[in-house]
């Protein structure tokens, strides 16, 4: 007999709590998006944080968005930027784009050149929205 979804979830949680960062990343995404489980942003935050601390780029990206938007936690622009930088350094194009957006929001004139560098990296990695923002900054 195949295990139920609840039994599978218990095993996943146990593996995460035993220190499996990949399982923590999996659980964080499941709870963040509400896939196969009811959405629970508090649990998502906990599991994604664990995975992020082990260097999981997607977890860092999702956490960055949570801190940026205040979704499931208090908004924290500095923490969002830190997490997006970690994910961007691992090649996540949308994280590169978000780094640029936060830099521009913090201090447009001071951070413009650095933001453009991040937008170019994002665009070169195939994130088309970065092209649009680059043309807006140049235009």
Regions found by a protein language model. Give the residues of each.
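Helix-turn-helix repeat elements of alpha-solenoid scaffolds
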Residues: 1-6, 40-42, 76-77
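Hydrophobic face of amphipathic alpha-helices that form TPR/SEL1-like repeat modules
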Residues: 26-33, 37, 62-69, 98-105, ...
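Short helix-capping/linker turns of helical repeat alpha-solenoids
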Residues: 18-21, 33-35, 40, 53-56, ...
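TPR/TPR-like (Sel1-like) alpha-helical repeat modules
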Residues: 110-128
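Terminal, low-structured helical/coil segments at or just beyond the last alpha-helical repeat
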Residues: 3, 123-139
